[in-house]
Amino acid sequence: MDIRAAEISAILKDQIKNFGQEAEVTEVGQVLSVGDGIARVYGLDNVQAGEMVEFENGTRGMALNLETDNVGIVIFGADREIKEGQTVKRTRAIVDTPVGKGLLGRVVDALGNPIDGKGPIQSTERKRVDVKAPGIIPRKSVNEPMATGLKAIDALIPVGRGQRELIIGDRQTGKTAIALDTILNQKPLNVEGAPEGQKLYCVYVAIGQKRSTVAQFVKVLEEQGALEYSIVVAATASDPAPMQYIAPFTGCTMGEYFRDNGMHAVIIYDDLSKQAVAYRQMSLLLRRPPGREAYPGDVFYLHSRLLERAAKLNEDHGSGSLTALPIIETQANDVSAYIPTNVISITDGQIFLETDLFFQGIRPAVNVGLSVSRVGSSAQTKAMKKVAGKIKGELAQYREMAAFAQFGSDLDASTQRLLNRGSRLTELLKQPQFSPLKMEEQVVVIYAGVNGYLDPLPVSKVRAFEDGLLSLLRGKNVEILNTIRDSRDLSNETAAQLKSVVEGYAKTFA
């Protein structure tokens, strides 16, 4: 067999020509020590603060402490498989998450990975979880309502789109119930074909809660048809502290996608006390100096940089908004503890829930005296302003008088009248769970209350009166509700029509 050298060299040259060798250079370090969800790593000299790193077994971590001789890394997962001497490599990416409409209807973990068993997320875009809040120029003052569907809140402590309203109270006072009702109340706005400017997408971040609680929450959303316009981010009690720390930022980035694209979203952080506890744990293990109540010095900055990202943007920036409803759990009604005072000072008002009111049957258990909205009536429709202005004054007088009435038995007629009216208005503001009311329905109910149509009734009959009046208006007199809804105002003409309907109903009811 004749082998020609020229042929062989031609074949070899041809093969060598197509042989491209690309060396991939990655910066790696070595684990010095690991334990309690923290790894100390030597050798990652150029790592950035907040950068994702990857351990040998695929577990991810985040570089938080950049020291002279080592890097403190918090681990997003179990640290059992990580051993001293193993290599750690940089990913050159700051922690990010998928964003977009593909996340709606899904339950994800603190890094945006699906945990609901419905397959991969249909999302192409990724965004960093910890970004700067919008500056002063892109913002606009809050001017449109974000209806919760709860009379006690929409009338007395109105929340606007782009506002940050704290929900604060002891355990088991109905904080999550208010958040859930707010999500359910957005269902009529999120119907197919509704304009984007009207829709309000919901993001719910569960931090440090039991898995059974989160599962129950998702089940209710599904049953009520509210999951399709909601995203649930869950970092449960059994997840590592770094996951509970990062979850609110992940949820916020998902909400910001809507805000920055001219849409509207509301995000609920349930709850930030547990995030602060997780952050305290991480900080102490990273040997950062402790401050008051052993929290690190920058725990205020932790919450302020998160809540400042909720904003109403002006027309030049798309008019989008992100409303934040952070939840804080107090211990024995102590609002003056460290974390509650911090978050109260950052937010634009608070809804204060009380155990005593809850057990008296006043639910939602809102303490109207201590709750405020610093945005106020600019977050209300004209119709609601007209009827709610009176109810605020009457309830304030009622609280004052009720305190005095405990001492004296012989009260003059006007005081007695005020106490009667107050007790009926308090009864009127009660509302069962999962039954949010539309704005126009709240207006007619409160109109009946402040104009004295409930005064002759016994307190026990107030609920029946309200239900009957609403069913009458939803049936025969639906045009009154439609007029209030479309004009967002209670004109003299509509008020006259409403007055005759309410008077007629009051006579038949008695």
From Swiss-Prot:
Q: Which GO terms describe its molecular function?
A: ADP binding; ATP binding; proton-transporting ATP synthase activity, rotational mechanism
Where along this sequence does the record place binding of ATP? Answer: 169-176
| The keyword Cell cycle is assigned to this record | no
Gene3D superfamilies the UniProt entry points to = 2.40.30.20, ATP synthase alpha/beta chain, C-terminal domain, P-loop containing nucleotide triphosphate hydrolases
Enumerate the subcellular locations listed in this protein's record, separating them with semicolons.
Cell inner membrane
Q: Which UniProt keywords apply?
A: ATP synthesis, ATP-binding, Cell inner membrane, Cell membrane, CF(1), Hydrogen ion transport, Ion transport, Membrane, Nucleotide-binding, Translocase, Transport
Q: Give EC number(s), comma-separated.
A: 7.1.2.2
Is Translocase set as a keyword in this record? yes
Question: Top EC class per UniProt?
Answer: translocase
Instruction: Kindly give the membrane topology term recorded for this protein.
Output: Peripheral membrane protein
Listed GO CC annotations: plasma membrane; proton-transporting ATP synthase complex
Highest taxon of the lineage: Bacteria
Q: What does the record give as the reaction this protein catalyses? A: ATP + H2O + 4 H(+)(in) = ADP + phosphate + 5 H(+)(out)
Query: In this chain's numbering, which residues are marked as the site (Required for activity)?
Result: 371
Instruction: Please give the PROSITE patterns that the UniProt record associates with this protein.
Output: ATPASE_ALPHA_BETA (PS00152)
Quote the InterPro entries the UniProt record gives. Answer: ATP_synth_asu-like_sf (IPR023366), ATP_synth_asu_C (IPR000793), ATP_synth_asu_C_sf (IPR038376), ATP_synth_F1_a_nt-bd_dom (IPR033732), ATP_synth_F1_asu (IPR005294), ATPase_a/bsu_AS (IPR020003), ATPase_F1/V1/A1_a/bsu_N (IPR004100), ATPase_F1/V1/A1_a/bsu_N_sf (IPR036121)
**Quaternary form?**
F-type ATPases have 2 components, CF(1) - the catalytic core - and CF(0) - the membrane proton channel. CF(1) has five subunits: alpha(3), beta(3), gamma(1), delta(1), epsilon(1). CF(0) has four main subunits: a(1), b(1), b'(1) and c(9-12).
Q: What does this protein do?
A: Produces ATP from ADP in the presence of a proton gradient across the membrane. The alpha chain is a regulatory subunit.
Give the UniProt family note: Belongs to the ATPase alpha/beta chains family.
Database matches in HAMAP family: ATP_synth_alpha_bact
Which PANTHER family does the UniProt record give? ATP SYNTHASE SUBUNIT ALPHA, MITOCHONDRIAL
Q: What is this protein called?
A: ATP synthase subunit alpha
In its UniProt entry, the species of origin is given as: Rhodopseudomonas palustris (strain BisB18)
* Gene expressing this chain: atpA
